[in-house]
């Protein structure tokens, strides 16, 4: 497995392989999806709480929306770590004043571009979910409406 000391964070750099660039684009798509999710959630809460005369909660939802809009809200991020065989996409949450690794979102084979759901922190589940070398798969995955930050799109249907 990739230990904390041995792993190397992937720098988002276009000089790396195409597959690395695709992983970076997937991370961007997941971050957009999470931002869109949070906006929808706070807009719904604002409307609901306002109709219930819960100004404390509707004010909170409105404040959260303002923070997202002006870029000060510490939204979830997705980082890419490079291992021997896989790129590991890891969810990063903002806690105690800094972003920290939370859970593994996906594994991507560095050679083939095959995308796997995680079986645990250090290994992928069996069964390829998507292939980043396939243009139609990329077109699907790079649209934030098609992926979800919680990983539901990685389940076999």
Predicted features and spans:
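Single conserved hydrophobic/aromatic residue that forms the stacking wall/gate
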Residues: 1-11
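A short, surface-exposed interaction/processing loop segment used at functional sites
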Residues: 112-144
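Short, non-transmembrane alpha-helical segments in secretory-pathway proteins
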Residues: 12-68
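A short, surface-exposed beta-strand/turn
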Residues: 102-116
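Exposed beta-strand-loop-beta-strand "reactive/processing" segments of non-cytosolic proteins
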Residues: 66-106
